[in-house]
Amino acid sequence: MRKIKTITYLFFVILLLSGCETTQSVRLNLEENLLSPETRLMTDNGPVIGFIDQLGVKKWLGIPFAEPPISELRWRAPIKINNWKTLKEVNSFSPPCTQFQSSLTADGLVKPGDIIGNEDCLYLNVYAPSSSKNKLENNNELLPVMVWIHGGGNTTGMPSEYNPEIFVKTENIIFVSMSYRLGFFGWLSHPLIREQSGLNASSNFGLLDQIMAVQWVKNNIQFFGGNPNNITIFGESAGGQDVIALYTSPIAKGLFERAISQSGGTSVT
């Protein structure tokens, strides 16, 4: 009986994956933003170059912070991204994590319920004001950092839906947004998963993605002009709920100094 249930379960998994491995979101900003030498810098993982928008905001869009959670890494805790040597151009959003199209943001090209996104989606985006400087020796001159966790019921949503340019420019902060696994891929609880060891058995893969993203920020944000000792995480709705989870998680201890939960709540048992 267990074998039959397992085969049935795998059948539905394959059916779902066949429709989402390569699907792209039509809302991605695929316009080629001109690379700017001023945004070239070295991270712990390798060199990147971004661009400067019309408001003078520096942007690095689509920086990988974990290995793609595909194949044998599907339904596993995220793994640190491998280092790269060649200059990585990060001037456009990565595909969002696989999800069903929300009725709130559907347009003429996609319908509610359509599968959009890609499993290879663990990327983050960094925004900095024109005044930011790379890795200053005096941490007092580094800027405050705010890390955004988007809402959407942990089933939908993507960083490209939020535009922090004015916020960054007027408040003189470093802003970071991230993608994390959603729905079926981020929160699946199943006996076969619970048989795994360590964090692989948690089923909270979306939260683990968020923690790894904040860890990446902690390790690298100084290169973008941000203060690694002045990080605030904040999120709205399900993102606010996730903020509370990170605030109480021992795994995330020491990664940030402040937390803001906007219209998010959770229960503790």
Predicted regions and their residues:
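Bacterial N-terminal signal peptides that target proteins for export
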Residues: 1-8
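Non-catalytic accessory segments of hydrolases
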Residues: 2, 21-204
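C-terminal motif of bacterial Sec signal peptides marking the signal peptidase cleavage site
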Residues: 16-19
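Alpha/beta-hydrolase active-site loop
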Residues: 121, 199-222
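Active-site loop->helix "elbow" adjoining a glycine-rich segment at hydrolase catalytic centers
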Residues: 151-152, 205-209, 237-240
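Alpha/beta-hydrolase fold nucleophile elbow
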Residues: 224-236
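Short glycine-enriched nucleophile-adjacent loop
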Residues: 240-252
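A conserved short beta-strand
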Residues: 253-266
